[in-house]
A protein has these predicted regions:
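Short, solvent-exposed loop/turn and secondary-structure capping segments
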Residues: 97-101, 122-125, 153-156, 167-178, ...
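Cap/lid segment of the alpha/beta-hydrolase catalytic domain
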Residues: 268-291, 303-411
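Sec-dependent signal peptide recognition
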Residues: 1-7
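Primarily recognizes the serine-hydrolase "nucleophile elbow" in alpha/beta-hydrolase
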Residues: 394, 400-461
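Bacterial signal peptide processing site
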Residues: 14-16
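Acidic, low-complexity Ser/Thr/Gly/Pro-rich repeat segments typical of extracellular/periplasmic
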Residues: 20-269
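C-terminal subdomain of alpha/beta-hydrolase-fold enzymes, centered on the catalytic histidine
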Residues: 141, 376, 380-383, 443-631
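A conserved hydrophobic secondary-structure block that centers on an alpha-helix together
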Residues: 135-162, 166-167, 287-332
Length: 631
């Protein structure tokens, strides 16, 4: 045999035959329909942060169309805790997907990677084999496991490798798009331009990629900081006298008024519009001024030389300015009752569109939480964040005639701006999470009736039963699964990402953006809280990386906190996160009552809450034992 023939025979014998691929293939066709290309994809994101999802399919439902339109006009970047998806031509083998709860690796068939740090984000995955109202057949949907929050303003990639198998048991083939130098239009070019980021991160492993999308997560920090600093500069002062309403054994109650800037456009209650207006620098633009009332509880005891420490209360939906002072019809039985004996004053206001601030003067808070107008819901929350900035500025210069509280022993009662605290409850915890992130004056905070994940809010919440409300609002059929993997719900959650508590939590200690010094935070959970179920609370606790006071009542809390390197800690504890104290306390709900309210109705919870702030006022916040007094 001639030498050339021998060489050809040797080459043929030594080269392995190509491995067969599955008939199921990933679909990446940017010239097709909406779900024929992966999402998020950089070609849908505009330079101003708005998102073009105008071709999102589904029935002509008013709320769905409003979500599509508002993301196109008022969106602020892709979500960090929202869903991603990729369609396939046929069914896959679900057993080839990564297991939930197992730490991700680059050997997984599907993973989400931070292309700037190379960190992997744990995922929750679902393959939707059947068509539903808002999703096609054979759609693979991934969400970050709620509580693992991808970094803000950072390039990420959702990657499917050839370790994913089709229903025939064979590996899915590589999408031709990954090796094409051109074609597919502007959106295809936008993704193609970012693929080198993934190639660099994966190196030789890039050859095993079957499909991928590369995108930059949104960042709410810059806008939050602009809102806070602009509102902080508003000239804040009490309008007229601060008058005494009544006295209780431990404190006196006062009421006053102040003006606040309103940044939302349009007419209240914002059934239309309601979006904040921003200038070219990103600062909010004042549309008008509104006069609101505040309530103030002043301890009936000697005032410290620097003034009383002051807690700012952010009430739940419908709560009045007196929510920290009274408990329903029980005057003087609010949390001010346990703060005042420890020398801590308290102040509160109503939310916008609540009580006398609502059109007609008697709002119960429903229109604040306006799901029918998603951008107004988002910016109602941000408007309240701005108002607490104004209130904090007011409080630094606020004085009360000392003769009104003789026990204070001062001619003029003042408040110590170096010892300001925040407590947000329920809806107020969403606002409070942002306030904690944005204002350096606040040195410690408590969030009660609190949790994370707008996706969970839309599908898990029992009070109100959100999944049952979502169905008619979005025109679901009985065959539809109302879960976190439904793409239309990601549109809603993306709109609300700037007020997502899980996004705020890293900014309390670990990822300081809108503030420069860390803060101590206490999460208070009742089990079961039907407004924020344990998985929702755990998601927030994970994102904040708190420790739970031992023994934990919810075993899943221990398991899930372990994923982020925290867990049970014996009380008392403090300074467990650098110099800050980050804790979660859990209590059983009282009989026939919802765990949502344990901070108000369990005596031992009230004391533990008060001790947290009393110790913060002394220099270091401490999570004390439930059955112990203050240190």
């Amino acid at each position: 045999m001639r030498p050339l023939g021998l060489a050809a025979l040797f080459f043929a014998c030594s080269t392995p035959a190509p491995q067969p691929s599955s008939a199921t293939a990933p679909v990446i066709d940017f010239e097709g329909r909406f779900f024929d290309a992966p999402y998020p994809s950089p070609g849908r994101l505009r330079a101003d942060g708005t998102i073009d999802v105008g071709d999102f399919p589904g029935p002509t439902i008013a709320l769905k169309q409003r979500l599509v339109d508002q993301l196109g006009t008022h969106g602020e970047g892709f979500g960090r805790s929202t869903a991603m998806w990729l369609r396939f031509t046929d069914a896959i083998d679900p057993s080839s997907l990564p297991q939930l709860g197992v730490a991700p690796t680059l050997d997984d068939s599907v993973f989400l990677i931070d292309l700037e740090s190379n960190a992997l984000v744990p995922l929750e995955l679902k393959f939707k084999a059947e068509q539903e109202t808002y999703s096609p057949r054979n759609l693979l949907v991934a969400t970050p496991f709620q509580g693992h929050v991808p970094a803000a303003g950072t390039w990420h990639a959702l990657v499917v490798t050839t370790k994913l198998k089709g229903a025939d048991g064979l590996p899915v083939p590589r999408a031709a798009f990954l090796d094409q130098a051109s074609g597919g239009g502007a959106r295809a070019d936008a993704l193609r331009a970012e693929l080198p980021r993934l190639k660099t991160a994966l190196g030789d492993r890039y050859g095993s990629v079957a499909a991928a999308t590369v995108f930059r997560t949104g960042s709410h920090w810059e806008r939050l900081q602009k809102i806070a600093t602009t509102a902080r500069a508003f000239p804040a002062a009490a309008v007229g006298p601060v008058t005494k309403l009544r006295e209780h054994p431990g404190f006196a109650v006062f009421e006053g008024e102040l003006d606040v800037p309103m940044y939302q456009h349009g007419d209240e209650p914002y059934s239309e519009d309601g979006a904040m207006v921003f200038d070219a620098t990103g600062a909010p633009v004042q549309q008008r001024v509104e006069r609101i009332r505040f309530a103030l509880a002043v301890p009936r005891r000697a005032m410290p030389a620097g003034g009383f420490p002051l807690l700012f209360h952010v009430p739940g939906s419908g709560g009045s300015h007196l929510a920290i002072i009274d408990r329903g019809a029980n005057l003087g039985r609010g949390l001010a009752e346990v703060l005042a004996p420890r020398g801590i004053a308290a102040i509160g206001i109503e939310a916008n569109l609540t009580g006398p601030r609502a059109p007609g003067g008697s709002g119960n808070g429903d229109i604040f939480y306006n799901v029918f107008n998603p951008v107004a819901l988002r910016d109602n929350h941000r408007q309240q964040v701005a108002e607490y900035e104004v209130l904090a500025t007011l409080a630094k210069g606020l004085t009360v005639d000392g003769a009104q509280v003789a026990e204070a022993g001062a001619a003029s009662i003042r408040f110590d701006g170096s010892r300001f605290f925040v407590h947000g409850h329920s809806t107020g915890s969403v606002v409070g999470a942002s306030v904690v992130s944005s204002n350096e004056s606040f040195r410690a905070a408590a969030l009660s009736g609190a949790g994370g994940s707008w996706l969970y809010n839309l599908v898990l919440k029992q009070t109100p039963a959100s999944a049952e409300l979502v169905k008619p609002l979005l025109g679901y059929t009985d065959a539809d699964a109302v879960d976190i993997f439904d793409p239309v719900l990601t549109l809603a959650a993306t709109m609300w990402e700037p007020i997502e508590p899980m996004n705020q939590a890293p900014g309390w200690v670990r990822d300081l953006r809108a503030r420069t010094t860390p803060i101590s935070v206490l999460l208070v959970e009742g089990i079961v809280d039907t407004y924020y179920l344990p998985r929702m609370v755990n998601a927030l606790a994970m994102s904040a990386r708190v420790d739970v006071a031992a023994p934990a009542l919810d075993p899943d809390t221990v398991t899930e906190l372990a994923q982020v390197g925290t867990g049970p800690r014996a009380t008392p504890f403090s300074a467990n996160s650098g110099g800050s104290t980050l804790g979660l306390v859990q209590y059983p709900a009282l009989p026939n009552q919802d765990g949502h309210f344990v901070v108000f109705n369990r005596p031992e919870t009230r004391v533990q809450y008060a001790c947290f702030f009393a110790s913060a006022a002394s220099g270091q916040a401490v999570v004390v034992a439930a059955d112990a007094g203050c240190p």
